[in-house]
């Protein structure tokens, strides 16, 4: 097969460091290494959060209302359209069904180019946090129309695929999971001096939350449950890793926690390895990158029984899956792990073993094969 040319359209490629931007940059790096030409179209800012991979073409955008750190495209002007036409992609990959994604879909239809899409954000689960849940039927109607015009849709987990099927998205759904660097994230990164630096003793039982700090990911639920545990177990400490708009509010309701701010690389790996339990009650994930990082670091995981983490955590094997509304069950599961050192270690070992199934090379190789499958039709 001749060299493949892929045009990728996304709402975030480098202006915010999150699971979407990191996943897409890893994909582009893999594609370039495997002799695939790639052109990316996305909103940009003057001071991006990460150094992007590949050739990025900026599109007009404005701040997203209510979430000004994110940007939303406002269109696909003639200048960018000419660049796309000159590139003449073999396949159009749309990562966000926003205005830019809609324009890309319409262009690809007119140009008779195959269209694929990847599902990164569980949009409908966010509506309740903004008190606009009444818009959910309209949103699903649009998503159904959008994805049913794609030849393939790549979802990060089977649980997410099941949800799309429930909403009558009938296109070819493929599992494109997320990978992990098992050399970076590993129990061997545990170091008592790191704990000391954070004001934590080796005898402490550290319960950790890692995420971009936004209320949609339920950091307040984490705070409520761990504060309750601390009234019973004096050795329990809370470690909160990340930054975001909810940080100041979280510090107000949970000043006792240790806050590291944003971490990456070896420091992020150390934060997991120096923890004892990972507690992540977010129910808005499509995959659960942080859960996988915790697993690779050998931690038992107490997570919300929702899309994303439920594809990674086996209840009573490497952690506990709890319906997000059952706060007492989160408390009791964490209490069990605090009191039972052997269970904590056994579940952590199971997490470590399961994480070995997820390597970026194998996962992105699978996506490249999906591209080739579409192009062979």
Features from the language model and the residues they span:
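Conserved acidic donor-binding segment of nucleotide-sugar-dependent glycosyltransferases
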Residues: 315-316, 320-327, 336-342
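Short alpha-helical donor nucleotide-sugar binding micro-motif in glycosyltransferases
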Residues: 84, 262-263, 270-275
